[in-house]
């Protein structure tokens, strides 16, 4: 059975790069009918926070990236790691290193001065003398000195590293806590991971980790190192590019499936298809098709994909995601048309759920002022006669339906022998308060007959006031 995992460190937010790694691992497991595990790598006790753990859990839940096992916390497995470290020590495959931080700094500076690659020189590898006083040792793994490590990476291809290029890895800190490189190997071994999908910033650790697997008598998993996500300027993605917490995208009005659709396209493609449902991603995703080159984050593209998903998603899902934004704005959706009808009308134009909620306000809330620009352009004295006639026709309608409303507006334009725009635009401003809305007849139908007649009254008052001030 295929087994994958997502193993974030709770030392900050769950960001775009991390989510893409989680998504690729989740998709691969789903497609292969395998098992996906969430593991929290919280061994860095100084930097790990409960707030970050919660942000990871909340982000995964919002995105719908469900896991078959977990969350598993590394801090609950310290006894296991210590037993493995002791086993390596007992078998002569690990050793105490007493080099002080100052000693290591001097070593690296001397190597740089000689033009060598800075690395630990193995000075305590075969040490059997008296340990220096006052130094708490770390424990290092004895990396093989001969031979080479071959990685057949599913994304990067074959990578060959000579063991003489690798120094001896620290597997336990001076306080006895295990390091990332030890815990990740033990966890993936114990949890029988078949595929490790992670960012290519981990690729330098992989040869050392493979040697650790071999020392433990374990079969290494298959590796797939996916390239990082860059900002539009070509530098590593950071907060200024939008590498904020994934939950920020929720707050900014993105649908979770739109964000996943955008992320799956960062480094992977299927023919020339841009828009994918979750099921299509599961069916079509191929790990071997992931591009080995970095991808560029583009907010405009994300907005476009979000717009497509707003248009195509199931109306119940749209309403479920839109409702919190309506509540945030203090819009009581019980006092007005059904939110599903409003959402259906607004979904064609909105790029985000925030835009949608802003546009929906006039369906539920009356207003006393009009958008200044729209009023200046369309609520002019010349609009008074068309508005009065439309108001009269609206008041006389016995059936308040979009087609009847359309007929009334059309008839008013014909009666006055003017173009539809000279009736429609002032009417749009009158009943919505601004210059943009979906079709005026469908909008008016949802707002309601009485409200439309009353709002036209307000617009006529604004025109009167304008005439008085001119």
Curated annotation (Swiss-Prot):
* One GO term (biological process): glutamyl-tRNA aminoacylation
Catalyzed reactions: tRNA(Glu) + L-glutamate + ATP = L-glutamyl-tRNA(Glu) + AMP + diphosphate
Q: What is its main location?
A: cytoplasm
Signal peptide location in the record? none
What GO molecular function annotations does the UniProt record carry, in alphabetical order?
ATP binding; glutamate-tRNA ligase activity; tRNA binding; zinc ion binding
The record's listing under InterPro entries reads: aa-tRNA-synth_I_cd-bd, aa-tRNA-synth_I_codon-bd_sub2, aa-tRNA-synth_I_CS, aa_tRNA-synth_I_cd-bd_sf, Glu-tRNA-ligase_bac/mito, Glu-tRNA-synth_I_codon-bd_sub1, Glu/Gln-tRNA-synth, Glu/Gln-tRNA-synth_Ib_cat-dom
Source organism superkingdom:
Bacteria
Please tell me whether the keyword 4Fe-4S is annotated for this protein. no
| Known EC number | 6.1.1.17
Motif stretch ('HIGH' region):
8-18
Q: Which terms are listed as keywords in the entry?
A: Aminoacyl-tRNA synthetase, ATP-binding, Cytoplasm, Ligase, Nucleotide-binding, Protein biosynthesis
> PANTHER family attached here?
GLUTAMATE--TRNA LIGASE (PTHR43311), GLUTAMATE--TRNA LIGASE, MITOCHONDRIAL-RELATED (PTHR43311:SF2)
The protein, known as: Glutamate--tRNA ligase
Its encoding gene is what? gltX
